[in-house]
Amino acid sequence: MLGLVGRVVAASASGALRGLSPSAPLPQAQLLLRAAPAALQPARDYAAQASPSPKAGATTGRIVAVIGAVVDVQFDEGLPPILNALEVQGRETRLVLEVAQHLGESTVRTIAMDGTEGLVRGQKVLDSGAPIRIPVGPETLGRIMNVIGEPIDERGPIKTKQFAAIHAEAPEFVEMSVEQEILVTGIKVVDLLAPYAKGGKIGLFGGAGVGKTVLIMELINNVAKAHGGYSVFAGVGERTREGNDLYHEMIESGVINLKDATSKVALVYGQMNEPPGARARVALTGLTVAEYFRDQEGQDVLLFIDNIFRFTQAGSEVSALLGRIPSAVGYQPTLATDMGTMQERITTTKKGSITSVQAIYVPADDLTDPAPATTFAHLDATTVLSRAIAELGIYPAVDPLDSTSRIMDPNIVGSEHYDVARGVQKILQDYKSLQDIIAILGMDELSEEDKLTVSRARKIQRFLSQPFQVAEVFTGHLGKLVPLKETIKGFQQILAGEYDHLPEQAFYMVGPIEEAVAKADKLAEEHS
């Protein structure tokens, strides 16, 4: 049906074009071609077909041109709609093509989801009759798959009967939940100073070696333990080595369990060496896995995208290959649309939520670059990891003054939480201002009030550190998950001066404030 309608629209549009002069603008007709299939997409059906392979009797075409990752396919009848998946026949490995443009009445221009080496003109191509479909459901947990849903972890097929198309509409307004609610992570510095909203989008900024991966793994672990929720990790344009390391670290820390079905995370990888088509779609594959857990199981899902910049970069490559006129700094003209289409699907509905943590690479540290600038428009919170804090041995190395959150508002988090958070930031800012004086003149030159500020700030700084459960293997410290009430109470008491008599090392790498008191008593015993 879709193929037939797509055919009619294509024929009528191209008929209309014949009447135009050679210089007449084409975008309106091209827009019509692009919009028709999307408008006719049916509601998502997870068990619509037992396998994503093309159906018998599907429309067959043949390859007429191969230009790198772009493949032109000619169909004698039944032109496939935009975004349909086509499958090349007569190959050992599965090669999926996605329809990107209609060229005239019988030819489509497609983007390959894998290498096009060995393709020849005349090869047969089958229309699957639907967009790329991938396996979804609990069976994907603990597994790694690629953009088209094939397992790449050498552990056999993913045994699920449920498949879903990677392209879908964002939830309707009536389905969305408007309640603003904190997603408690159990990480003190995050929950207190830059809390995550359920269904929010968080930007994670950090260089190499400051603890991005460990923070991501702890979030996956804590969400599973505190909320019973699942996580999905989408590696977009990842280094293969880093993806491999992450997988093995997850096995070591128990986030992935190879022996039974208790794994808490599904992994989707589209590495740096993949063609641009795969890198531009792998984030949607990860999002589709997460949407199943939200919509069918009512879960609060965590979706990690590393790195969201690579999604934009791949889109830019695809756009250039399709011959579109580039926009600012050479990016695709549809940059905001591509980003918005994906980001709008990450939201809270009345059934569940998808909270997304997106690692963001900033090209040449230029925040005005169109790629990061477009991403910022969608973020609800930013978590900035600082090398200076990591050098002090304070982990997680989250910068308490640079990290922000849209829900840090007394009407959402409550006035007590808000006042404590602002009090903590004020005392840390005062300490930062005094550091130059301390470096030049020393602590003795400070007034008594300033000495007290410095003392409390150093205790707060250390109390913002926390032993992680996933890092127990490396640190030897027992990991701690701290409830929000305990976090607020602890910082409130430090600000009030209730623990001015305790040494600052008692606050380092502990969970709730009671542990700091117990550690201080233990230190006193050792010194006596």
Curated annotation (Swiss-Prot):
InterPro entries recorded: AAA+_ATPase, ATP-synt_VA_C, ATP_synth_F1_bsu, ATPase_a/bsu_AS, ATPase_alpha/beta_chains, ATPase_F1/V1/A1_a/bsu_N, ATPase_F1/V1/A1_a/bsu_N_sf, ATPase_F1/V1/A1_a/bsu_nucl-bd
Residues bearing carbohydrate: S106
Modification type Phosphothreonine: residues: T312
Gene3D superfamilies according to UniProt: 2.40.10.170, Bovine Mitochondrial F1-atpase, Atp Synthase Beta Chain, Chain D, domain 3, P-loop containing nucleotide triphosphate hydrolases
Residues reported in the UniProt entry to bind phosphate: G209, V210, G211, K212, T213
Residues recorded with modification N6-succinyllysine: K124, K161, K259, K264, K522
Naturally occurring in which organism (per UniProt): Bos taurus (Bovine)
Entry EC number(s): 7.1.2.2
Name of this protein: ATP synthase F(1) complex catalytic subunit beta, mitochondrial
Primary gene name: ATP5F1B
Main subcellular location: mitochondrion
